[in-house]
Amino acid sequence: MNTVKTVRELRAAVARARSEGKRIGFVPTMGNLHSGHIALITKATQRVDFVVASIFVNPLQFGAGEDLDKYPRTLAADQEKLLEAGCDLLFAPTVEEMYPDGMAGQTRVSVPQLSEGLCGASRPGHFEGVATVVSKLFNMVQPDLAIFGQKDFQQLAVIRALVHDLNMPIQIIGEPTVRAADGLALSSRNGFLSEEERAVAPVVYRTLSSIAESIKQGERDFPALIQAQRQQLEAAGLRPDYLEIRHALTLRPATAEDRDLVILVAAFLGTTRLIDNLHLNLDTPA
């Protein structure tokens, strides 16, 4: 596996692979890799001939007071994991390489509607930052396909819309969330949890599962269901940012008639913000 730090080196390496007739797969990350990230790399190796990963902690998607400065940087360990997983090329640029003219005047990419509400409400500008950096990375790599985790469900919806609306010839694949044995979704931010908080954290997924089970059993009073489960989160010591049932494709608030649903949650446990979701299609046999 080669590691490159400049756009010029990246494009040269990808061009060589293309000249050999290889299909290109891309997995963008912010580093501090865990088993969830590695599952994306593994999936890519099964689908394409040449796998590119990126590690870039993107300042444009962090708001004031968020954890940009303390976000873990673990490049050497990440390189070892990527190599073992079969990654062919790692792009690990600096902020200056990604934004050579600074960020203040940087052209921004915005995906309206899908970026609003949920994480977009509590993290203003976040999805604009995501859409902008992903657009830049897609233009740099020009992959045949790109793979993202479904844990960031709203982000995945934004990226699908971005690719569709801007006519990018890239197949977007969403991979199921990888979980610990107790159900907690794997996340780079889980490392911020204390031992006591980590013991409490699985209640997030249990809450989603409980809501899904109630819906499967015929419950359609979504506001009452959400209110009861929100209280359960609070009783466990979490501070819910949101807990909502949405239509899985449009992300609009779900109605009792909808069949393709996603239950989404964001909640603070101590100072750590945890997000998770559970996709529930009532027309798909269990």
Curated annotation (Swiss-Prot):
Residues reported to bind beta-alanine: Q61
Binding site for ATP: 30-37, 149-152, 178, 186-189
GO-annotated biological processes: pantothenate biosynthetic process
Presence of the UniProt keyword Cytoplasm in the record: yes
Keywords: ATP-binding, Cytoplasm, Ligase, Nucleotide-binding, Pantothenate biosynthesis
GO molecular function, one term: pantoate-beta-alanine ligase activity
Pathway(s) the chain acts in: Cofactor biosynthesis; (R)-pantothenate biosynthesis; (R)-pantothenate from (R)-pantoate and beta-alanine: step 1/1
Keyword Nucleotide-binding included in the entry's annotation: yes
Broad class of enzyme this protein falls into: ligase
Name of a matching Pfam family: Pantoate_ligase
Signal peptide coordinates: none
GO cellular component: cytosol
EC numbers for this chain: 6.3.2.1
Active site: H37 (proton donor)
Catalysed reactions, as listed in the record: (R)-pantoate + beta-alanine + ATP = (R)-pantothenate + AMP + diphosphate + H(+)
Highest taxon in the source lineage: Bacteria
Chief site of localization: cytoplasm
Family matches, as Gene3D superfamilies: HUPs, Pantoate-beta-alanine ligase, C-terminal domain
Residues the entry annotates as binding (R)-pantoate: Q61, Q155
Subunit structure and binding partners: Homodimer.
Function: Catalyzes the condensation of pantoate with beta-alanine in an ATP-dependent reaction via a pantoyl-adenylate intermediate.
Recorded family membership: Belongs to the pantothenate synthetase family.
Other facts: The reaction proceeds by a bi uni uni bi ping pong mechanism.
Protein's name according to its UniProt entry: Pantothenate synthetase
Organism expressing this protein natively: Pseudomonas fluorescens (strain Pf0-1)
